[in-house]
Amino acid sequence: MSVQIPVALPQNAYEIAIANGGLAAAGTWLQQADLKAGTKLLIVTNPAIGRRYGDRLVAALQEAGFIVDCLTLPAGERYKTPATVQRIYDKALELRLERRSALVALGGGVIGDMTGFAAATWLRGISFVQIPTSLLAMVDASIGGKTGVNHPRGKNLIGAFHQPKLVLIDPETLQTLPVREFRAGMAEVIKYGVIWDRDLFERLEASPFLDRPRSLPANLLTLILERSCRAKAEVVAKDEKESGLRAILNYGHTIGHAVESLTGYRIVNHGEAVAIGMVAAGRLAVALGLWNQDECDRQEAVIAKAGLPTRLPEGIDQAAIVEALQLDKKVQAGKVRFILPTTLGHVTITDQVPSQTLQEVLQAIANP
């Protein structure tokens, strides 16, 4: 099975390739993306992914004539820092990577974000390839060119837009993905259903396998990957630099990022935080008269069915969430912009959220 989805940007167009066995054929895919044999490639990965898939990828790329080296970085959101990216720069310097060289991100969203940021800034910009191995990275983080690292006071505050040459998705890598990480990716899939693709939402809602990722039928997994990637590609093609429409992809992320930051990126993972953020956004939309209660309840039920949290972590200070929102990247003129549903498949962007309403919603989803 192979599906190719174009990301139709005026100057930086590329393809998302969804291909079973894609890792073994990586050399061919990179050549089709205009990376030539003889190019120096630095694969950036983490220990677990490197052990499982590193040798296979290196062999495939070397067979295609690429000059390949690897760098293993620690796993986890708390390591997505400038200090960790410095290690990529150091390795690039050691290997004497040139402007015609390329970085290859093999892993989840953290690896992809850091590798992309290093590629955006090394020699003022070199090529990079995304080979995501988590569901979350496949359907979201690897697509669209957002790269960056965290600041101690906020998530992704340091970054750049830098589009990959190729996104290569091999669904077979999901077979070894821990269940919790698979569920985290489902949060982003549910997001696409709410903001863009009502039919996708209803298929998720009807599936008896949503809480059993290991039992997910292959045809449903293929649909999830293809429809999610198409949704992201369509939005990015319309608004590459997030000047308007693309902000809808941050649905659930406004409060979600605050939750991640306040818990030190240790208690909840990104997908879990987004799930909590979607619950909050849905309830805000109902409170403001933008969304009906029935669809809000349906969203919350699907999130819970997928094994994702619908309440804030215990002990989190709601006032601290409100304060952390002021560091959100979408703040304009001191006002936090929220992405709120109006009907399944459609959302609106507003900065007209009374602080009292926000506090009431946060109180309602607090753990007792």
Swiss-Prot record:
- Domain of life according to the entry: Bacteria
Write out the residues that bind Zn(2+): 188, 253, 270
- Which residues are NAD(+)-binding? 109-113, 133-134, 146, 155, 173-176
The processes (GO biological process) annotated in the record are:
amino acid biosynthetic process; aromatic amino acid family biosynthetic process; chorismate biosynthetic process
Q: Which cofactor does it need?
A: Co(2+); Zn(2+); NAD(+)
Q: What is its main location?
A: cytoplasm
Named in its record, the pathway it takes part in is:
Metabolic intermediate biosynthesis; chorismate biosynthesis; chorismate from D-erythrose 4-phosphate and phosphoenolpyruvate: step 2/7
Q: What class of enzyme is it?
A: lyase
InterPro entries reported in the protein's UniProt record: Dehydroquinate_synthase, DHQ_synth_AroB, DHQ_synth_fam, DHQS/DOIS_N, DHQS_C
Checking Gene3D superfamilies in the record gives:
3.40.50.1970, Dehydroquinate synthase-like - alpha domain
Enzyme Commission numbers on file: 4.2.3.4
- Tell me the PANTHER family matching this sequence: 3-DEHYDROQUINATE SYNTHASE, 3-DEHYDROQUINATE SYNTHASE, CHLOROPLASTIC
Q: Which NCBIfam families match?
A: aroB
Per the record, the similarity remark reads:
Belongs to the sugar phosphate cyclases superfamily. Dehydroquinate synthase family.
Q: What is this protein called?
A: 3-dehydroquinate synthase
Q: Which organism is it from?
A: Synechococcus sp. (strain ATCC 27144 / PCC 6301 / SAUG 1402/1) (Anacystis nidulans)
